[in-house]
């Protein structure tokens, strides 16, 4: 219950703009760009440099895939719903700097396949 209250109580994620994400990628800043869609969606096209971790596996696999809880993470999905859930989950697991880009539909650049 404490995790649930903590996660949703302080759980409003800060939304990253397209320009902010583009600048971070261009400067090659040290952060994780986390795609929380399905493997099939990821294969159809993803933002370059993204790491795939489906949102329904975040709780089970975050520790092994994202060992540094201080490293900034920017999360995205298709529309923004799953990324918001994943951001709250990651914060509840102790990740300190989690931001939400929302949906890949906001991305105006090229996609990798």
Please report, for each region that a protein language model flagged, where it lies by residue.
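Rhodanese-like catalytic fold shared by cysteine-dependent sulfurtransferases
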Residues: 1-24, 31, 39-72, 78-113
């Amino acid at each position: 219950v404490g995790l649930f209250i903590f996660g949703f109580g302080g759980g409003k994620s800060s939304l990253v703009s397209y320009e902010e994400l583009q600048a971070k990628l261009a400067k090659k800043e040290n952060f994780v760009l986390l795609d929380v869609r399905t493997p099939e969606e990821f294969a159809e096209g993803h933002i370059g440099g993204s790491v795939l971790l489906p949102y329904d596996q975040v709780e089970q696999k975050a520790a092994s895939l994202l060992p540094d809880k201080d490293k900034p993470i920017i999360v995205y999905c298709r529309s923004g719903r799953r990324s918001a859930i994943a951001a709250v989950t990651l914060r509840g697991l102790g990740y300190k700097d989690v931001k939400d880009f929302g949906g890949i539909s906001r991305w105006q650049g090229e996609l990798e396949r």
